[in-house]
Amino acid sequence: MHKNWNYSNKPLANLESLFKMLETNEERLTYLLKNKKNYFKTVPVIRKGKKRTTYKVVGELLKIHELIKQRIFSKISLPEYITGGRKGVSYIDDCKSHLNKSIIIQEDMKDFFPSIKQDLIAKAFQYYMNFSPEVSSLIANLSTLEGSLVQGTKLSTDIANLIFLEEEALISEEVGKLGGNYTRYVDDITISFESEVNNEDISKIKTMILSMALKSGVRLNRKKSRVLRNGQSKIVHGVKVIKEIRPTQKRKHNIRMCLFNLKKK
């Protein structure tokens, strides 16, 4: 497997190095962790007619999150097939990777952020960045609420991208051998091929994705698992990807509703 990611900063070997990076001290971080719930504010969101709870981080913990993003995550170079959480890259770029293809495979990860646990996050910092165990555990603790990632914080997508790096490289490599493209936009995985691929190879790829998800404590949403072939409507992120990129009527409606709600505010 070719390693297609890199962390360019020096590994954090001890807590003193972390305190310096975050412009704080042990006493302040101990206080923040004791009162962590007070720094996570719920933000209800209506998506596809369903109410979801997202979070925003406030106050001193927000500053800590911003510094972690600037001084740790900005130093990670990610492979191009990760399209969520990358500066200057959007879901449209993800769609373009799958334009005018014969076969599209789609997988969705259910309850994505809450399924990623604090212990796994700490192990990822140790493995991918070579941080010490105590540094890794502290960053993981600062980044989570009640032992899990939550949707909406500045760090959630960055951390989720970190979790899958090695497994994803293997999947992308396997897909590439078959002449296909692999992308992941946050919790949505899309794979496409220009020509026909046999069912055995498709089954192998789907098994690899399932294995990656299970190793990370994430479940796949079977209701959203699809294999789309020629003659079927091919839609990625609410966008038609046939001969050109076009939003579906449903996506147009959702955009109009968002604009309407913004004007009301």
Positions of PLM-derived features:
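N-terminal low-complexity, intrinsically disordered segments
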Residues: 12, 18-26, 67-82, 110, ...
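Active-site and adjacent loop segments of nucleotide-processing enzymes
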Residues: 235-265
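Short, conserved non-catalytic motifs in the polymerase core
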Residues: 41-65, 83-87, 141-160
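Short acidic (Asp/Glu) and glycine-rich catalytic loops that position anionic groups and cofactors
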Residues: 45-48, 232-239
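Non-catalytic, polymerase-adjacent accessory regions of viral genome-replication enzymes
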Residues: 1-38
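A residue-level signal for conserved active-site and pocket-lining positions in enzyme catalytic cores
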Residues: 68, 156, 238
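Active-site-proximal segment of RNA-dependent polymerases
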Residues: 61-106, 111
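Conserved polymerase palm-domain catalytic core
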Residues: 32, 97-186, 190-229, 263-265
